[in-house]
């Protein structure tokens, strides 16, 4: 996908960079795979704010995505490639040979009319989902499971990809987009290729209003708050705020926040950068 800039006929157009949507082939989603989605506004079940800077935005409907790819051996044809307001990647509608319809994350290079299949006997081609033990070393992958049959949990956002670097016994060594190198069970599934919409990171809203349409509220800096509101607030005039901290007092910009005794740490060979 490419991006396009605009002539600065208005202040909001001057810095606006958005996608061209040239790969989108359908404007109406599959009705059987769409459900209502209520906006939380960053509040939990008792109404307490648990995430700041969320609220408003355009109404969205949730598209049910197949992250498990468990219809092994059943071929599917790519019917459409669609926009999904709930994620940065595009989604593809699959029509299976037995009549079932499912959405998947659209990988880079996927075309309408392509035939996809999942399972141990599938060819390592773009869009096919295979167990890691059946994927050649060095292959670029995405939608990676952490536990067999659980569904893809890693490498799902636009433009991302991981690489299968080696095998060690019943584990495969994967290099993730963050730079982390970790072991994952060879029975876990992954999809061949990288996630589509790779130019998403180049986009710029251009104006505050477009950001509000996305459901993101203004983000205020801690150093301009009062001491009651933030550890970095207060002071006479423009103060530096001291050591960078989060609102809850954790050191920012360098503090490792991962739990030191986390069970899964034994699978991490090299920490993320």
Swiss-Prot record:
One GO biological-process annotation of the entry reads:
cytoplasmic translation
Coiled coil region boundaries: none
Key word RNA-binding present in the record?
Answer: yes
Q: Where is this region: Disordered?
A: 196-273
Q: Which PROSITE patterns match?
A: RIBOSOMAL_L2
Keyword set includes Glycosyltransferase: no
Check the record and name the Gene3D superfamilies matching this protein. 2.30.30.30, Nucleic acid-binding proteins, Ribosomal protein L2, domain 3
Q: Where is the composition biased (Basic residues)?
A: 209-220, 255-264
Q: Name one GO molecular function term.
A: structural constituent of ribosome
Q: Sorted alphabetically, which keywords does the UniProt record give? A: Ribonucleoprotein, Ribosomal protein, RNA-binding, rRNA-binding
Q: Name one GO cellular component term.
A: large ribosomal subunit
Which NCBIfam families does UniProt cross-reference here? rplB_bact (TIGR01171)
| Family as reported in the entry's similarity comment | Belongs to the universal ribosomal protein uL2 family.
Complexes and interactors: Part of the 50S ribosomal subunit. Forms a bridge to the 30S subunit in the 70S ribosome.
| Function text | One of the primary rRNA binding proteins. Required for association of the 30S and 50S subunits to form the 70S ribosome, for tRNA binding and peptide bond formation. It has been suggested to have peptidyltransferase activity; this is somewhat controversial. Makes several contacts with the 16S rRNA in the 70S ribosome.
The record's listing under HAMAP family reads: Ribosomal_uL2_B
Protein known as: Large ribosomal subunit protein uL2
**What is the native source organism of this protein?**
Phocaeicola vulgatus (strain ATCC 8482 / DSM 1447 / JCM 5826 / CCUG 4940 / NBRC 14291 / NCTC 11154)
């Amino acid at each position: 996908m490419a991006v396009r800039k605009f002539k600065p006929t208005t202040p909001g157009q001057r810095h606006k960079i958005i996608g061209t949507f040239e790969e989108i082939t359908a404007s109406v989603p599959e009705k059987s795979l769409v459900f209502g989605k209520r906006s939380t506004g960053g509040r939990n079940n008792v109404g307490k704010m648990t995430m700041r800077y969320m609220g408003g935005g355009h109404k969205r409907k949730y598209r049910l995505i197949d992250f498990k790819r468990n219809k092994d051996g059943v071929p599917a044809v790519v019917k459409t490639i669609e926009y999904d307001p709930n994620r940065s990647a595009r989604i593809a509608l699959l029509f299976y040979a037995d009549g079932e319809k499912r959405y998947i994350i659209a990988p880079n290079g996927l075309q309408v009319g392509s035939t996809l299949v999942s399972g141990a006997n599938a060819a390592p081609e773009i869009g096919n989902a295979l167990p890691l033990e059946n994927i050649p070393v060095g292959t670029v992958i995405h939608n990676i499971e952490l536990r067999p049959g659980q569904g893809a949990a890693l490498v799902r956002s636009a433009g991302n990809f991981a690489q299968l670097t080696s095998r060690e016994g019943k584990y495969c060594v994967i290099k993730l987009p963050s730079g982390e190198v970790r072991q994952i069970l060879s029975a876990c599934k992954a999809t061949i290729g990288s996630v589509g919409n790779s130019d998403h990171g180049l986009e710029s809203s251009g104006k505050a209003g477009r950001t509000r349409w996305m459901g993101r509220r203004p983000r205020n800096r801690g150093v301009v708050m009062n001491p009651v509101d933030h550890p970095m607030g207060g002071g006479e005039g423009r103060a530096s705020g001291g050591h960078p901290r989060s609102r809850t007092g954790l050191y920012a910009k360098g503090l490792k926040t991962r739990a030191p005794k986390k069970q899964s740490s034994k699978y991490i060979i090299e920490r993320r950068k």
